[in-house]
UniProtKB/Swiss-Prot annotation:
Disulphide-bonded residues: 63-72, 68-80, 73-90, 78-92
Modified residues (4-hydroxyproline): 55
Reported function: Alpha-D-conopeptides act on postsynaptic membranes, they bind to the nicotinic acetylcholine receptors (nAChR) and thus inhibit them. Through its two C-terminal domains, this homodimeric protein would bind to two nAChR allosteric sites, located outside the nAChR C-loop of the principal binding face and at the adjacent binding interface in a clockwise direction. This toxin specifically blocks mammalian neuronal nAChR of the alpha-7/CHRNA7 (IC(50)=0.12 nM), alpha-3-beta-2/CHRNA3-CHRNB2 (IC(50)=1.08 nM), and alpha-4-beta-2/CHRNA4-CHRNB2 (IC(50)=4.5 nM) subtypes.
GO terms, molecular function: acetylcholine receptor inhibitor activity; ion channel regulator activity; toxin activity
Residues found modified as 4-carboxyglutamate: 49
Source organism (scientific name): Conus mustelinus (Weasel cone)
Compartment(s): Secreted
Stated name of the protein: Alpha-conotoxin Ms20.3
Domain notes: The cysteine framework is XX (C-CC-C-CC-C-C-C-C).
Length: 94
């Protein structure tokens, strides 16, 4: 398969299911301001924190654990700390 075809295939498949290793999930609410909040209150969803990508956007990222900057912490019980020159990161006990 030519390189261009492989790249295009990856670009088509990648956005379909965007989950990171720490339990982050991209969700789409509705166009109203509290769409993500209403989405999370339905069913058995147990998401701790959400962040809308851009103001007025209906897309956002939600974490099953604590959100630190733009990433999800690896497990619950972590705190978000600032590391000089490296930015925000998760500090987890034990």
């Amino acid at each position: 398969m030519p390189k261009l075809a492989v790249v295009l295939l990856v670009l088509l498949i990648l956005p379909l299911s965007y989950f990171d290793a720490a339990g982050g999930q991209v969700v789409q609410g509705d166009r109203r301001g509290n769409g993500l909040a209403r989405y999370l209150q339905r069913g058995d969803r147990d998401v701790r924190e959400c962040q809308v990508n851009t103001p007025g956007s209906s897309w956002g990222k939600c974490c099953m654990t604590r959100m630190c900057g733009t990433m999800c912490c690896a497990r619950s019980g972590c705190t978000c700390v600032y590391h000089w020159r490296r930015g925000h990161g998760c500090s987890c006990p034990g």
